[in-house]
Amino acid sequence: MKFELDTTDGRARRGRLVFDRGVVETPAFMPVGTYGTVKGMTPEEVEATGAQIILGNTFHLWLRPGQEIMKLHGDLHDFMQWKGPILTDSGGFQVFSLGDIRKITEQGVHFRNPINGDPIFLDPEKSMEIQYDLGSDIVMIFDECTPYPADWDYAKRSMEMSLRWAKRSRDRFDSLGNKNALFGIIQGSVYEDLRDISVKGLVEIGFDGYAVGGLAVGEPKADMHRILEHVCPQIPADKPRYLMGVGKPEDLVEGVRRGIDMFDCVMPTRNARNGHLFVTDGVVKIRNAKHKSDTSPLDAECDCYTCRNYSRAYLHHLDRCNEILGARLNTIHNLRYYQRLMAGLRKAIEEGKLESFVTEFYQRQGRPVPPLNVD
């Protein structure tokens, strides 16, 4: 992987990630394909929304179908027939989401398989091996996603262990002869001094890109913005910056304003299945009765298949009847909305008009522009 930085506007960056499997224009949003599919979508449909890279879930694909089935096909690209690059998370977040059925040690994490209850162990080395078999174009280190809230002492211990795991991840990645990219993950909760230690330690190990982890886990938005403002300038400028698990459209806008290049989140697909649809002027809850006889498109400014062909009334009807097509059409729209938003941000950065774009984005939704505390 090669990262090319074209231009900046304030702290916002316009560039691209170059892979053997294709080019990803940044800032970029990655749809989430947890089980080897972006829910309800064919790879061709995902590509048609403008997505150039997707995310796969190491933890879930390891448990089912497993490494051996994956290797029978070649790798995850061959298994799911996605031709572009794939980033896989390390499995850490899912393991730590298991709560009481997992035990963290210096060696790794002991837990019970949520499918059948069998005892399982996952550590940095195993995570690197699974992601190698998946053929991931971007591999994420195995870390502990520090929960929120966490006091300073716990966050410090967690961050320090994640640094040790980062070195173990790097060593195993290299010993496998993996020629793809490996990203480090910055931890430290909402504490700037701990984030400083994490960034410094990861940069000393050396990675192809750096993710900001442990945000969007329940902390106030002001804390997320503050940490991004503090951390991003410390990440080497020639490396991509990835904000994990984020987020709402406004979170993408605020991340880009602070220097983030990559995002992923289940929100556009999950919300689509629940009838929450993102449009230029905010959010449409399509199951509300007021849409029953509305013959207008979901978003007059959207060029997606759904908006070009169907009315709000039809989407409302499909939702009320619990038709699978409704979830699919909603997903096509939400994914396209996110990709149109990213394309708009990229164009605004190129033209040096990012703040004008941001102002219009919020004005259309009747909301104030959040403060930006950067030099």
Curated annotation (Swiss-Prot):
One of its GO terms (cellular component) is cytosol. One of its GO terms (molecular function) is metal ion binding. The keyword Transferase applies. The active site is at D89 (proton acceptor), D264 (nucleophile). InterPro entries: ArchSynthase1/Queuine_TRR, TGT, TGT-like_sf, tRNA_ribo_trans-like. It catalyses: 7-aminomethyl-7-carbaguanine + guanosine(34) in tRNA = 7-aminomethyl-7-carbaguanosine(34) in tRNA + guanine. Its cofactor is Zn(2+). GO terms for biological process: queuosine biosynthetic process; tRNA wobble guanine modification; tRNA-guanine transglycosylation. Keywords: Glycosyltransferase, Metal-binding, Queuosine biosynthesis, Transferase, tRNA processing, Zinc. Residues 245-251, 269-273 are annotated as: RNA binding. Pathway: tRNA modification; tRNA-queuosine biosynthesis. Zn(2+) binds at C302, C304, C307, H333. Signal peptide: none annotated. Binds 1 zinc ion per subunit. Substrate binds at D89, S90, G91, G92, F93, D143, Q187, G214. The keyword Transferase applies. Its EC number is 2.4.2.29. Belongs to the queuine tRNA-ribosyltransferase family. Catalyzes the base-exchange of a guanine (G) residue with the queuine precursor 7-aminomethyl-7-deazaguanine (PreQ1) at position 34 (anticodon wobble position) in tRNAs with GU(N) anticodons (tRNA-Asp, -Asn, -His and -Tyr). Catalysis occurs through a double-displacement mechanism. The nucleophile active site attacks the C1' of nucleotide 34 to detach the guanine base from the RNA, forming a covalent enzyme-RNA intermediate. The proton acceptor active site deprotonates the incoming PreQ1, allowing a nucleophilic attack on the C1' of the ribose to form the product. Homodimer. Within each dimer, one monomer is responsible for RNA recognition and catalysis, while the other monomer binds to the replacement base PreQ1. PANTHER family: QUEUINE TRNA-RIBOSYLTRANSFERASE. This is Queuine tRNA-ribosyltransferase. It comes from Salmonella typhimurium (strain LT2 / SGSC1412 / ATCC 700720).
